[in-house]
Amino acid sequence: MIRRQLINFQNRSVDVRVGLGAFDELSRMFASAVGKPKRAMVVWNDATSERFGEVVERALVDAGFAVSQLSLEVSPAGATLADADAIFGALSANGVTCDDLVIAVGDAATCSVVSWCANQWCGRTECALLPTTFDAMLTVATTMKPLVASSVNALPAIAFRPEPGLVVCDLGLVREADPEDLKLGYVVLVGTMLSSSKSRWNQFTETVPEILAGEEVALVNAVQWSQTARKD
């Protein structure tokens, strides 16, 4: 089951797809992300590229894109202005224009900096985010992890509401993750639900056992509830 959610903002909407095996449908999703597939640039780190490279590249090629890549090691604590500069340099070197597609595969920090760079490039270039951590799945459609000035100066330098066109959350990554790696996501989820309505909080508390057990419908609901609450 792959459920679709449109999160509407003032001038545009974010297309969020959530479910087990969502990455298996990437080709179809990528093909509809832009008017006419031409060029696509993927940003990820070495570990993410090794794990998802074949799936993502094949999906882009099948959708009609010529694919370029940038390997970038972004700190989970937050991307830096130097990371953003590296992305801008790669966009220029690969001839990416506002008619093309920029894709981020990784954690919240990686998705955030790529989304921001795509939004600035050529007046705005379409962006697709493939979050690979639970906390990123809960946040990247609506909330940016701030860029910091540098690895030495960790004060937030840039933050804005992200505007990706497409976010794809494959819940199989949550099911197979180490429980320790899910803790931040649980913290984000509880904090978000606490700030939501009482009825939504009650719905959430009733499904906590199913969420912890990795039950698909409960996880899909959790991601969608979180995105909706964070939008507001």
Language-model segments: which ranges?
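Active-site segments that bind and position negatively charged phosphate/pyrophosphate groups
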Residues: 211-232
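A short, small-residue-rich loop immediately preceding and capping a beta-strand
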Residues: 94-117, 121-132
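Predominant activation on well-ordered alpha-helical scaffold segments within soluble catalytic domains
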Residues: 27, 85-88, 187-191, 201-205, ...
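Residue-level detector of flexible, active-site-proximal loop/helix-junction positions
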Residues: 74-76, 109, 134
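Short, glycine- and charge-enriched coil/turn segments that flank and shape catalytic ligand pockets
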Residues: 36, 64, 208-218
